[in-house]
């Protein structure tokens, strides 16, 4: 007769804490994450991530994709889309009409963007006007050291790269907030309006431009001094900001968090943690059965719109170009493809337990989270992966001894969220979300588990290498 304990063992399931099941995993995970932290520190924007990724790809033997060229199994290629997104592939032994293994992450993150006409002076202080990008909680972005990143196109067409606040000795920038002594009325605001969008103004200077040859000072001398310093550094004028993409991001570096150093704290881990693990898994794939397609896309945080986001056709066009190398039917390629939408999920936070449904939440240190659907209010705006797709991806991870878990994004009707999965599915592919659980998502300092990061890499590698 079967005992209750035997039945419990055979019929029930709980996702384990990785370190309790595999004590040897810590060393490999910690070593892998050193490279991840270093990459994060030098790739805070989508342009920087693309450039750094291309450096790693070139060092690993990847070459730019050429239309009309014949490729053989094991060949490695990449395609850069307008400097802000990219796709890369390792050719497999199976014909392209059998489908590809597609893994899509995004490399943009919430931030403060400059408005097209940003520079102004107010009561002898110089400021930048900003328009926030993505779903930020605005109150989190005040009194935080910020760095200036981006590009400016000068009148003569020259592209100037801008970066201030990242190197030792650089100045940083800041959005101010009220002192508590004068904050009584501000305290009456709802939390979402504690800081308003038009209050996210960045301090850039407080000293005037002084011309000793003139007896009377010029108008807006503080603003002029800031512009003069930028002109000295980069040769730009105020008019050039209209031809610019300037982003302000936290000036902090990726750091270990906790006495046991088990967590990583850094800006932009949504979704650069999945982008980095996808990139390294792609590079480490040598002889796949299916041709791999790893996509690092832009604009996910604002709906994937624009020609560098996955709501455009740039990935479809890349796949069409791949198909053309073998004269393959693109519809068969798409229909037979299995894909991952590699994006983070919100890890269970016991300090705010009421917004989660614990049984269907994801937790740190239990591995990458397989998210069947996102959306809200009846799964609206979701892909909702099929049982067959779930079974295939789970089987691949299980056969590779990958720790993983399932999870939703919060309790029903508590909120919403989306990924690129629905845009991948729109190309007639089977797709499911898989990514790292994150604490403090969309804040200037997000937290991830080193064990989760490492096993996400292992999950992606298993997915790309599997012949299932």
Where do the model's predicted regions map?
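N-terminal hydrophobic/helix-forming segments and targeting peptides
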Residues: 1-468
């Amino acid at each position: 007769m079967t005992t209750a304990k035997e039945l419990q063992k055979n019929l029930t399931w709980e996702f384990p804490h990785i370190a309790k099941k595999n004590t040897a995993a810590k060393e490999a995970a910690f070593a892998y994450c050193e490279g991840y932290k270093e990459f994060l520190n030098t790739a805070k924007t989508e342009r920087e991530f693309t450039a750094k990724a291309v450096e790693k790809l070139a060092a690993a033997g990847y070459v730019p994709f050429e239309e009309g060229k014949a490729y053989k199994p094991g060949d490695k290629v990449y395609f850069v889309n307008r400097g802000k997104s990219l796709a890369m592939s390792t050719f497999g032994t199976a014909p392209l009409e059998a489908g590809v293994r597609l893994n899509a992450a995004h490399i943009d993150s919430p931030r403060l963007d400059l408005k097209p006409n940003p520079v102004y002076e107010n009561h002898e202080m110089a400021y930048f006007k900003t328009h926030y990008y993505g779903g930020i909680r605005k109150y989190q972005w005040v009194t935080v050291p910020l760095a200036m990143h981006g590009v400016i196109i000068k009148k003569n067409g020259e592209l100037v790269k801008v970066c201030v606040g990242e190197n030792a000795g650089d100045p940083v920038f800041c959005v101010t907030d009220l002192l508590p002594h004068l904050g009584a009325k501000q305290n009456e605001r709802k939390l979402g309006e504690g800081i308003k969008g038009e209050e996210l103004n960045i301090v850039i200077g407080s000293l005037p431009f002084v011309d000793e040859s003139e007896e009377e000072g010029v108008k807006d001398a503080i603003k002029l001094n800031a512009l003069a310093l930028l002109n000295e550094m980069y040769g730009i004028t105020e008019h050039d900001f209209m031809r610019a993409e300037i982003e302000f991001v936290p000036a902090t570096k990726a750091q270990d968090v906790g006495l046991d150093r088990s967590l990583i704290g850094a800006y932009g881990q949504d979704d650069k943690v999945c982008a980095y693990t996808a990139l390294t898994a792609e590079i480490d794939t040598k002889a796949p059965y299916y041709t791999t397609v790893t996509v690092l896309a832009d604009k996910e945080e604002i709906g994937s719109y624009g020609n560098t986001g996955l709501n455009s056709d740039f990935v479809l066009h890349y796949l069409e170009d791949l198909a053309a190398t073998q004269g393959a039917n693109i519809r068969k390629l798409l229909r037979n493809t299995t894909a991952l939408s590699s994006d983070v999920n919100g890890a269970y936070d016991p300090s705010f337990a009421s917004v989660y449904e614990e049984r269907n939440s994801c937790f740190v240190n239990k591995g990458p989270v397989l998210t069947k659907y996102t959306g809200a209010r009846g799964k609206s705006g979701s892909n909702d992966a099929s049982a067959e797709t779930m079974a295939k991806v789970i089987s691949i991870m299980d056969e590779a001894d990958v720790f993983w878990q399932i999870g939703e994004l919060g309790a029903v009707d508590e909120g919403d969220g989306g990924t690129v999965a629905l845009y991948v599915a729109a190309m007639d592919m089977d797709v499911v979300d898989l990514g790292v659980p994150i604490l403090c998502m969309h804040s200037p300092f997000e937290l991830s588990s080193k064990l989760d990061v490492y096993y996400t890499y292992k999950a992606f590698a298993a997915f790309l290498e599997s012949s299932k």
